[in-house]
Amino acid sequence: MGEKRNRNGKDANSQNRKKFKVSSGFLDPGTSGIYATCSRRHERQAAQELQLLFEEKFQELYGDIKEGEDESENDEKKDLSIEDQIKKELQELKGEETGKDLSSGETKKKDPLAFIDLNCECVTFCKTRKPIVPEEFVLSIMKDLADPKNMVKRTRYVQKLTPITYSCNAKMEQLIKLANLVIGPHFHDPSNVKKNYKFAVEVTRRNFNTIERMDIINQVVKLVNKEGSEFNHTVDLKNYDKLILVECFKSNIGMCVVDGDYKTKYRKYNVQQLYESKFRKDEDKSVKQ
């Protein structure tokens, strides 16, 4: 039997499918979000799987965005200088034309989760906005997926997730500013850093040839151990406490910092490998019994 159709000749699930939107384009400087690798030719299906997973996690962590929207915006404005606030308000005014609903004249709220088609094989990207902190958001998801009590396989096409806290243009001077912004709280802030860490830098480049991989690594290592720092962090490629992830795509560089359990416990945030490992352990346990 064929699928049920309504009076207009459309199938019953057409409205649900319309809710899923993928924008096309490049990643702007300052973008926060989550890269996801997936099976070849299944980029859209992977994005749909992630949309369900991400929206559930968003509701769990943050609830209805309307409740905290004004508060987060006020906090953001407090952190800005007067000059920056004026610039921000001008940018918001300029963006009202594209953000207005023509039928009602009301400005649409920006979605905290927005998928972007990068036109790159086996990769999709989800742009995030406040209150989402990408690295914390992804870690919470990985904890759920790694839970041995949770044996439901939520995804089929998704492979690896990589959060980026912020991003910048593919220029060395911009990379330096980005690195100082991202790594500072993890390596230089005495209120957060309690010891000398072993760390490593992992660089992934896709359609990117602007800056050499080793130049990126050497620069980031130099900034971690900057002159005048009260800490003496050391490079350890295998047994690191912290890993600095650098994602380079076309003209954009994204960066974040994750803990050592990224590799030891969460399979480098590879969802597929995490599932396989969990199911294998469950099978071995059943055989022994």
From Swiss-Prot:
Q: For bias kind Basic and acidic residues, which ranges apply?
A: 1-10
Keyword annotations: Acyltransferase, Cytoplasm, Nucleus, Phosphoprotein, RNA-binding, Transferase, tRNA processing
Q: Which residues form the THUMP domain?
A: 146-259
The biological processes this protein is annotated with in GO are:
tRNA modification
GO CC, one annotated term: nucleus
Q: Kindly give the SUPFAM superfamilies that the UniProt entry links to this protein.
A: THUMP domain-like
Predominantly, its location class is cytoplasm
**Record keywords: Nuclease included?**
no
One of the record's GO molecular function terms: RNA binding
Disordered: where is this region?
Answer: 1-31, 64-83
Q: Where in the cell is it found?
A: Cytoplasm; Nucleus
Residues found modified as Phosphoserine: 72
* Cited function: Probable tRNA acetyltransferase required for the formation of the modified nucleoside N(4)-acetylcytidine in serine and leucine tRNAs. Binds RNA.
List other remarks. Present with 2630 molecules/cell in log phase SD medium.
The protein's name is: tRNA acetyltransferase TAN1
Organism this protein belongs to: Saccharomyces cerevisiae (strain ATCC 204508 / S288c)
